[in-house]
Amino acid sequence: MKLRTNAGPLQGTIQVPGDKSISHRAVILGAVAKGETRVKGLLKGEDVLSTIQAFRNLGVRIEEKDDQLVIEGQGFQGLTAPCQTLNMGNSGTSMRLIAGLLAGQPFSVKMIGDESLSKRPMDRIVYPLKQMGVEISGETDRQFPPLQLQGNHNLQPITYTLPISSAQVKSAILLAALQAKGTTQVVEKEITRNHTEEMIQQFGGRLIVDGKRITLVGPQQLTAQEITVPGDISSAAFWLVAGLIIPGSELLLKNVGVNPTRTGILEVVEKMGAQIVYEDMNKKEQVTSIRVVYSRLKGTIISGGLIPRLIDELPIIALLATQAQGTTCIKDAQELRVKETDRIQVVTDTLNSMGANIKATADGMIIKGPTVLYGANTSTYGDHRIGMMTAIAALLVKQGQVHLDKEEAIMTSYPTFFKDLERLCHD
């Protein structure tokens, strides 16, 4: 598709779609809780729809009523062996978390994904789940999908130190641990997003978080809840950056989830000189509205414990850095290489093709700014965040056109992205 270029100031108010991480977990926990769980504000992107379809195939009744998702949970014992292969589409979250959940079920299942998901390593969940007594295997020593899993009704608790910072691996182990008899401990390398821990407790589960150590004694039963999903900060990030780098812009981003394990991007942009104001902050619900205006920015260093708190925002932060004065250095982000694409390489190649000055490193990028961006032929490579980053970059282009292939990937997390973009350009 041909992207909008040479945009004037962006003006207006955006209600970003529901948080993807919380939407997945609301469906997963609701499916094994006892009773009727109702979810408001659910993200209806393709990844979450993959999770919903998987649980329908596992015998859970899920339907939409009055703009809510209603899940009829029957407890952990209520899942039934699927008649077909579980297709997770492009969703690594679905595959890893549901594999953890199915670890304690007395049946076997085959899990597949699309071409992109089939290139993402599952060894990170295979090894701890095997230690718990699950028969699980993928292709090659990296355990690429498809995954074959035979659950075990007598799961063993484990103490497991995560070799990488990964909320998905932590979550897979905790979902299995809810069905294991005894004490499971997970020790994190760096603290990652904690939605699974918070939501297990919201559904009546018990666990103890002590710094980087999470302790859960199983087995446990969960109770149905009413869940309201806040707006996704990872989706809001695209408008946050657009407002900061397009001269004359002023945007209000409403109802954005600001769980502290996800707010790394806000700390980074403020350090770079961003003018942002928080309005209607609700600390208990961890939501706020964010007012953002065009700002002159300076380069910064992003590394260490900050990385897991903004891992999904790094592509759009890279674009931001191309417009900042000086050098921005992103380190300790090797996890980007095994996302939907090798995001270090794809971000570097895409933005450099438009005139940026970025050097890829083994674990990050060195970005020199400010640079003028020009037209180019680009692709999402099937990665939603690359697509949205490119669409925001195109707004800065004064000369030439920007063409984007495989734009349908954006449906993964933000089905109304282009509609919202047009509205902000015209408001």
From Swiss-Prot:
Gene from which this protein is expressed: aroA
Protein name in UniProt: 3-phosphoshikimate 1-carboxyvinyltransferase
Molecular function as annotated in GO: 3-phosphoshikimate 1-carboxyvinyltransferase activity
NCBIfam families: aroA
Pfam families, sorted: EPSP_synthase
Residue positions binding phosphoenolpyruvate: K20, G92, R120, Q168, R343, R385
Subunit architecture: Monomer.
Family: Belongs to the EPSP synthase family.
Record SUPFAM superfamilies: EPT/RTPC-like (SSF55205)
Subcellular location: Cytoplasm
Catalytic activity: 3-phosphoshikimate + phosphoenolpyruvate = 5-O-(1-carboxyvinyl)-3-phosphoshikimate + phosphate
Organism: Streptococcus pyogenes serotype M4 (strain MGAS10750)
EC number: 2.5.1.19
Stated role: Catalyzes the transfer of the enolpyruvyl moiety of phosphoenolpyruvate (PEP) to the 5-hydroxyl of shikimate-3-phosphate (S3P) to produce enolpyruvyl shikimate-3-phosphate and inorganic phosphate.
Gene Ontology CC terms: cytoplasm
Positions contributing to 3-phosphoshikimate binding: K20, S21, R25, S166, Q168, D312, K339
Source taxon at top rank: Bacteria
Record-linked Gene3D superfamilies: Enolpyruvate transferase domain (3.65.10.10)
